Amino acid sequence: PRPPPTAVQAASALASSGPRGLFNTHRPLLLERDQMDRPTDLLPVDDELLTIQTEVREQFGWELDADASSARSMLEAVEASEIDDWTRPRRAASVASLIRRTVLRPTEVAVLGAAVEADEVLRMLERPALLVASDGSAGILSTLPDSTAERAWSRLACIVSDGDGGQGTAEAVKRGTPVFLHAHGDNLAEWESLLEIAAETPTPSPLVLTHQTPTTIPGMHNPGGFTDGDRAACVVRSMGVPKEAITMLGTRTDVVGRWSGVTDAETKMEKLQWMDRILRTLEIDY
């Protein structure tokens, strides 16, 4: 059998989008084999991550059709735009670029959660680490002293967002930070708004589109995850970053973080228990 692809091979190849329908049932999740064929597809590192998404829908009474409809609408909206960086080949190239940045040079990756504090970020900046922000947590970077803030923004590899992160998310988008934009059943207005902000900037953010259905959607990815924080960890693992190289900052299950955006506190606390299960599935400490 062929050996698994190296990070160099994965980063230099672009995903092809063959003439398939919009929705196709997932093949068995043999990550190495799939990545040899489509190196920039971001697949779950563990089948359990897709099972959890199904259980979450059942727990909260959400419909799979709503998740699929939002995903389809997002894909159509992005691909109907006239922004060159949002075409399907350029989105695949954005994945390849992020793989090069996060994997080819062995480095730590710090995922910023909704409860992240400035001192945690400052300590991480003392090391050669990259940052990945879960939605509005990117806002913590602008609370740092000016010179340090700009250095921190330069370390931000991407944000992972479903569009409801408020000012922190908007600022990252206005800076042209790459965005993993997520579709689910009740965030149509949020992702539409974020796309409008991005489209109006001089240099629109590169996009990678994600969904949470158990089907393959060409042009989109489902690396697993539920909340923005644990989905960010799923994204980083799916790109090939070892679990030992990932540090979770501001990831807590006992409080609703200040960067969570507008949310119902009771429901959010329930969601955080699912985040805990996902991170345990990934074997990532926090």
Predicted regions and their residues:
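N-terminal donor/sugar-recognition subdomains of glycan-related enzymes
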Residues: 29-109, 119-122, 256-286
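Glycine-rich anion-binding loop/nest that anchors nucleotide
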Residues: 110-116, 135, 221-229, 244-259
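Glycine-rich beta-alpha loop segments
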Residues: 122-127, 134
